[in-house]
């Protein structure tokens, strides 16, 4: 069968499959078909709930199978290692906290991989950025193998006083420093994270076989490079691989702790499941590796990405992953490669981060859909389910708060926490860590903050910037609070409206309402007491910050 015909059939097939999945979920939601229910529908179990429950079950199953595959791969390490290609570690730095940057560079120095090339590119060449070059000299600059260059320009914008000849000379100097040095640091004109990554990739060219990416707030496990490299060298159809990203400062605040349990679920359940089918949709910036031969193919297209006529300057890592998928190569995840990274400790900075990630998610969802036909049907199915789920959830919440009864609202809240407890219990089993039970707390954060942030992200999808602000910068942007405030007002208004319009409670409904309220209250009291007893007492105690041996560097 001709290749063009095969491709056309796959495009049609995956498109019909995506429509069937979306149509099935929509039909189940609209019809509200119920398998079982009590009299007057105080309790019920319907088709829509069954579909969501089945999705979570299947996702958890394939995540478990992928972890079992990883463990078996680890047991096979006694066999002779295959030929190892050359690797360059590229670190993107911007207004980084000095302590985090030192930890990052020291961890890079300790990586157990011979002849690893380390390239750090600093986004900024002003006097206030010079401390990062000083830290580079302090940690890695004490040998003849180290080199650096302070560049007035970058590859796409000339600095003040630069001529065409001096700009070209600067480009050549950057390439020479990067290729001739084992450890190199380039300070360049500010241009954003994508500009920084481009400089590292462009300067390396085809001088290495694989490129590992890393953020400057990341502490790397000594074995992280070899573990990701093993995945790439075992299967030539794998174009990129990501590792297990955990939180470096998880006990700094309640928001960083909840982020830590959410990270674990995102990587070890959601991405592990995607990895089983070879379609991980985002190789995270703190820990990822790509085949350089592929990266150099799409480097210019990746850098010059546009959306709705505007140049894209966020979602760099997700688009990098999408470019690999667009070529038909598989993307994988390995929990055997680990790192620790900083996460926001303040609610506002966390909200800004999540809004930006949501922007890149929805934008890249559209790009990713162009390549559904090149990969397993799971990628199509999961993209449809996760892409449309927030909208179904918002519609459900608004309907319940404005057209339901008080009991319906309480039952919904109880159901949300029940699903959260089930997922948290599974995570406790899979990870072997009782702390994962607090994953159920994250559901409240999702309902109250992430849902409105996603809608706001779509509305402002073309607004750009560097990313989450540098660790030395105090966040003063309160714009993210606007959608959250509106959402809370909508919910409170709906609750008041429902309470005002509702008839007197029947005896049965009153009994359900009192029982449900007591159960919901007891749940939160118990979980908060556990949090205060187990987690809160650790906050601020630096010796307990790190759960991995490689963190103390």
From Swiss-Prot:
Pathway: Glycan biosynthesis; hyaluronan biosynthesis. SUPFAM superfamilies: Nucleotide-diphospho-sugar transferases. InterPro entries: Nucleotide-diphossugar_trans. Glycans are attached at residue 462. Its cofactor is Mg(2+). Pfam families: Glyco_tranf_2_3. It is a multi-pass membrane protein. The enzymatic activity depends on the availability of cytosolic levels of UDP-GlcUA and UDP-GlcNAc. Keywords: Cell membrane, Endosome, Glycoprotein, Glycosyltransferase, Golgi apparatus, Membrane, Transferase, Transmembrane, Transmembrane helix. Residues 1-15, 66-377, 430-440, 495-515 are cytoplasmic. One of its GO terms (molecular function) is identical protein binding. It catalyses: [hyaluronan](n) + UDP-N-acetyl-alpha-D-glucosamine = N-acetyl-beta-D-glucosaminyl-(1->4)-[hyaluronan](n) + UDP + H(+); N-acetyl-beta-D-glucosaminyl-(1->4)-[hyaluronan](n) + UDP-alpha-D-glucuronate = [hyaluronan](n+1) + UDP + H(+). The chain crosses the membrane at residues 16-36, 45-65, 378-398, 409-429, 441-461, 474-494, 516-536. O-GlcNAcylation increases the hyaluronan synthase activity, HAS3 stability and its plasma membrane residence. The concentration of UDP-GlcNAc controls the level of O-GlcNAc modification. GO terms for cellular component: early endosome; Golgi apparatus; Golgi membrane; hyaluranon cable; membrane; nucleus; plasma membrane. It is found in: Cell membrane; Golgi apparatus membrane; Golgi apparatus, trans-Golgi network membrane; Early endosome. Its EC number is 2.4.1.212. It is an enzyme of class 2 (transferase). GO terms for biological process: carbohydrate metabolic process; extracellular matrix assembly; hyaluronan biosynthetic process; polysaccharide biosynthetic process; positive regulation of DNA-templated transcription; positive regulation of hyaluranon cable assembly. It comes from the Eukaryota. PANTHER family: HYALURONAN SYNTHASE, HYALURONAN SYNTHASE 3. Belongs to the NodC/HAS family. Homodimers. Forms heterodimers with HAS2 and HAS1. Catalyzes the addition of GlcNAc or GlcUA monosaccharides to the nascent hyaluronan polymer. Therefore, it is essential to hyaluronan synthesis a major component of most extracellular matrices that has a structural role in tissues architectures and regulates cell adhesion, migration and differentiation. This is one of three isoenzymes responsible for cellular hyaluronan synthesis. This is Hyaluronan synthase 3. The gene is HAS3.
